Amino acid sequence: MAKKIVGFIKLQIPAGKANPSPPVGPALGQRGLNIMEFCKAFNAQTQGMEPGLPVPVVITAFADKSFTFVMKTPPATVLIKKAAKVDKGSSKPHTDKVGSITRAQAEEIAKTKMPDLTAADLDAAVRTIAGSARSMGITVEGV
């Protein structure tokens, strides 16, 4: 028989930096899950990633206090800001432009995000990434 699911916990944790302090500790402690076990498993799985890159994770909590977790790809906005070498997007995205990325950079971001996007092919994914960049005040050359 399948385990009874008592809830899902969605968090964004920097790669390799999960620790029992907030937001991880309180979120897992509320459900009675082993916080250190999660932190060790998460840090081990994010070892190959760039340290500090925020990684969305969905933790499934079961009635017997066990858990599983699924890691997603880093948010597109973070990858776009990194590619454009800017700290934050524009406060007036359609009038003030803060940076630009090339189509090749947009394709690289789209390849990274492909598992989490609903796009049918790479070209559609690139257009999705370009739309996100435009809404941040970053121009995409060649799209």
UniProtKB/Swiss-Prot annotation:
Modification note: One or more lysine residues are methylated.
Keyword match Ribonucleoprotein: yes
Stored Pfam families: Ribosomal_L11, Ribosomal_L11_N
Domain of life assignment: Bacteria
PROSITE patterns associated with the record: RIBOSOMAL_L11 (PS00359)
Molecular function (Gene Ontology), one example: large ribosomal subunit rRNA binding
Keywords from the UniProt entry: Methylation, Ribonucleoprotein, Ribosomal protein, RNA-binding, rRNA-binding
Entry's Gene Ontology BP terms: translation
Cellular component, GO annotation: cytosolic large ribosomal subunit
Subunit structure: Part of the ribosomal stalk of the 50S ribosomal subunit. Interacts with L10 and the large rRNA to form the base of the stalk. L10 forms an elongated spine to which L12 dimers bind in a sequential fashion forming a multimeric L10(L12)X complex.
Entry function: Forms part of the ribosomal stalk which helps the ribosome interact with GTP-bound translation factors.
Similarity field: Belongs to the universal ribosomal protein uL11 family.
Protein's name according to its UniProt entry: Large ribosomal subunit protein uL11
Gene that this sequence comes from: rplK
